[in-house]
Amino acid sequence: MRAGRGAGCWVTVLGWAMTTIDATVVGIALPAIGRDFCAGLTELQWVVMSYTLTLAGLLLFAGTLGDRYGRKRIFLAGVVWFAMASLVCGFAPSAALLIGARAVQGVGGALLTPGSLAIIEASFRPADRGKASGAWSGLSAVATAIGPFLGGWLVQAVSWRLIFAINLPVAAVIIAAGVRHVPESRDTGLSGRPDIAGGILVTVGLTGVTYGLVAGPGGGWTRPPALMPVIAGALLLACFVAWERRARAPMLPLSLFASGQFSAANVVTFAVYGALAGALWLLPVELQQVSGYAALQAGISLLPVTAIMLVLSARSGALAARIGPRLQASAGPAVIAAGLALFARIGPSGNYLTEVLPAVAIFGLGLAITVAPLKAAALAAVSARHAGMASAVNNDVARTAALIAVAVLPAASGLTGTAYLHPARFSADSARHHSSRPACAWPAARWPHSPSPTPARRPARHRSGGTAHRHFTLEPLVGSRTDRL
């Protein structure tokens, strides 16, 4: 690869694509999973959240493991882990075992995700990194686009279980090619032990908070089953912050947040991706349960979002590089909020041209305006030496926002129990859910410290040689929707 061979690049791209496709297809399969297991909405939430929880909690820690012990080694270990967990998911006899297997699958995703781009950065000559990063970004976008098609077809034609089983042959190809073509690399300048305590504190803390937020609607927010996990989780997260302040090799360098621009960019990221996750979690279920869409129809309903982002995201990132990200980071969330408000108009008829398409088109336009400048603003706020860590932190903030949103928004709008199985009730509750999400995105548009460019320099470039927006635009995009096509 150092001589320009591209086989290793394709291996890492395929690894990233495997996790991306898996994330997009699960949302399409939720109604089928619920029917097979007679599962309530809380259990379906945990099918999604258990994966996101371990992925978000361990992502930064797994990145440090690759830097210390070898990126190829950790990447391939993550692929094996992910594949074995996928096998258990595919044969899960109950919702409880599926949820547990999804949590284990998230650990594998955390192990392989950081290495997928880091291997390219470390293995290619500087002159080749831009091209390699572009291939990585482009195929990630393709994976995001085909995931809903593949998931909808598998669920409709065969079984939801195949969305997990399909990972096994893909993983076998990755391992066989990776052993041969991916070179080993590590950061020889690192010393000391990895931040194991930090990884445990943040993961268990997020678990406690998430569990309490999901348990609240069923048993009451002030009752011990909901209140105690939230309190314990919050205390553990506070301990995590205190630990990171004094750790010799912290998993999360808190010094990054000394920059007001970096902090503001991540606040806006949290708001935008919280609203995004709520939309992408609910809409496939709503279209199938309320509007009568088949799984494949629901799977391709968000295709306009992907298309708009593919066409406009690079242009939005280039504009932010010229004029600074303040305008787009302020206007974009307002457009997202408008699109989310239109989701509330989608009813039992589910007419694609008059109800679904306007909502997803405006929603996608807002994402295209916002996402790339946000990433650029976060990277511009730090030195080039910390660009990789800043990118990882921003990505982790997006995933944590998705976790919290899926836990909170359904309960806040009354979507509990088996409401999703009753179209009339689900339609009314989902309208409240859609109406609540613009409140997540709108504060981002009015954030008083909207990210602004650093006068002395343009937004920093990622170490891979490509601009930041090229490999971020579609990372956390998970889910799908449509009218009768």
Task: Give each language-model segment a name.
Residues 95, 159, 186-191, 216-222, ...:
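Membrane-interface helix caps and helix-loop-helix hairpins in membrane proteins
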Residues 1-4, 188, 450-485:
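Intrinsic disorder in cytosolic terminal tails and internal cytosolic loops
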Residues 1-180, 316, 323, 341-344:
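Transmembrane-helix bundle of Major Facilitator Superfamily
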Residues 160-200, 248, 258:
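Conserved aromatic/hydrophobic "specificity hotspots" at molecular recognition or selectivity sites
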Residues 6-21, 26-28, 41, 116, ...:
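12-transmembrane solute porter fold
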Residues 66-67, 71-73, 129-132, 188-194, ...:
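Interfacial helix-loop-helix linkers and transmembrane-helix boundary segments
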Residues 80, 201-206:
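Alpha-helical transmembrane segments
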